[in-house]
């Protein structure tokens, strides 16, 4: 069996290290390269020795080399690096999977950049979260007169708020209600706060601890509350999800894809 060669941008970050370990243990894929910033002292070292797994490739600071040696590239970094990766992916005609979060990434119109490659962008590669989004969409449609509240708890270091996962769930709820997502946000504590309309989606954000990820979506009427919850127990969840998504994406024709596309294809 020929294994898929996967390059990893940001290979020594938290998510990058998990990806290196997960892919190295897979019978279906192998790490073809790991990228770090120019000037990183680990450039030229054996990736597996740094991360602590069975991976013999050398760490590089050349984005071009990473794409040339890979069948597909995964990046979980920042919006600026994401844009560089898109340009290089188009140049080298290689599929790209991105899990970069933050407002700048969320506001990008990827169809303006993607012309000749398969590309998947998501703020959460967890199968559980994406299944939850489907349930939330259906509940929002059926429970059309219930208030919708989304609460999240993340580690104290998380920069974006609400999180990308909360936005996935909010978009699903807005789709179920058939209302524009931009019109459906109602964030606690803002100067614009006013009386909540039934078709607005409330967001509450908590931060604390070092390694938390917990999301709740509540549908509330005068008589009852229905509560959906997703809690991450092990961050390896994201590496497993990214690997599954990459193995699917590498077989697709050019286009912009979502996790929903992938999950619909494997049903």
UniProtKB/Swiss-Prot annotation:
Binding-site positions, NAD(+): 10-15, 99-101, 122-125
Major localization listed first in the record, in broad terms: cytoplasm
Root EC class: oxidoreductase
GO biological process: diaminopimelate biosynthetic process; lysine biosynthetic process via diaminopimelate
Pfam families: DapB_C (PF05173), DapB_N (PF01113)
Reactions listed under catalytic activity: (S)-2,3,4,5-tetrahydrodipicolinate + NAD(+) + H2O = (2S,4S)-4-hydroxy-2,3,4,5-tetrahydrodipicolinate + NADH + H(+); (S)-2,3,4,5-tetrahydrodipicolinate + NADP(+) + H2O = (2S,4S)-4-hydroxy-2,3,4,5-tetrahydrodipicolinate + NADPH + H(+)
Keywords annotated in UniProt: Amino-acid biosynthesis, Cytoplasm, Diaminopimelate biosynthesis, Lysine biosynthesis, NAD, NADP, Oxidoreductase
GO molecular function term, any single one: 4-hydroxy-tetrahydrodipicolinate reductase
Binding of NADP(+), residues: 37
Annotated catalytic residues: 154 (proton donor/acceptor), 158 (proton donor)
EC identifiers of the protein: 1.17.1.8
Key word Iron-sulfur present: no
Any coiled-coil regions, as ranges: none
Gene3D superfamilies associated with the record: Dihydrodipicolinate Reductase, domain 2 (3.30.360.10), NAD(P)-binding Rossmann-like Domain (3.40.50.720)
Compartment(s): Cytoplasm
Residues reported in the UniProt entry to bind (S)-2,3,4,5-tetrahydrodipicolinate: 155, 164-165
Pathway(s) where this gene product acts: Amino-acid biosynthesis; L-lysine biosynthesis via DAP pathway; (S)-tetrahydrodipicolinate from L-aspartate: step 4/4
GO-annotated cellular components: cytoplasm
Similarity field: Belongs to the DapB family.
Function field: Catalyzes the conversion of 4-hydroxy-tetrahydrodipicolinate (HTPA) to tetrahydrodipicolinate.
HAMAP family for the chain: DapB
Record's protein name: 4-hydroxy-tetrahydrodipicolinate reductase
Species for this entry: Ehrlichia chaffeensis (strain ATCC CRL-10679 / Arkansas)
Lineage of the organism: Bacteria, Pseudomonadati, Pseudomonadota, Alphaproteobacteria, Rickettsiales
Gene: dapB
């Amino acid at each position: 069996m020929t294994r898929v060669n996967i390059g990893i941008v940001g290979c020594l970050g938290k998510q990058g290290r998990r990806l290196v370990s997960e892919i190295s243990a897979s019978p279906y894929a192998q790490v073809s390269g790991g990228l770090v910033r120019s000037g990183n002292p680990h450039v030229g070292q054996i990736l597996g020795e740094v991360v602590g797994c069975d991976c013999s490739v050398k760490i590089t600071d050349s984005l071009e080399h990473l794409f040339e040696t890979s069948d597909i590239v995964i990046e979980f970094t920042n919006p600026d690096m994401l844009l560089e990766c898109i340009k290089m992916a188009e140049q080298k005609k290689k599929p790209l999977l991105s899990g970069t979060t933050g407002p700048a990434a969320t506001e990008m119109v990827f169809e303006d950049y993607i012309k000749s490659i398969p590309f998947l962008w998501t703020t959460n590669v967890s199968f559980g979260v994406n299944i939850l989004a489907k349930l939330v969409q259906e509940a929002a449609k059926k429970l059309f007169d219930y208030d919708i509240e989304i609460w999240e708890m993340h580690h104290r270091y998380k920069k974006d708020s609400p999180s990308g996962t909360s936005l996935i769930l909010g978009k699903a709820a807005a789709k179920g209600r058939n209302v524009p997502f931009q019109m459906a946000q109602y964030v606690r504590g803002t100067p614009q706060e006013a009386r909540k309309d039934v078709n607005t989606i409330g967001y509450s954000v908590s931060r604390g601890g070092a390694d938390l990820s917990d999301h709740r979506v509540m549908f509330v009427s005068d008589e009852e509350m229905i509560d959906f919850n997703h809690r991450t127990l092990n961050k390896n969840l994201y590496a497993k999800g990214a690997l599954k998504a990459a193995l699917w994406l590498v077989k697709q024709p050019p286009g912009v894809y979502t996790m929903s596309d992938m999950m619909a294809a494997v049903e």
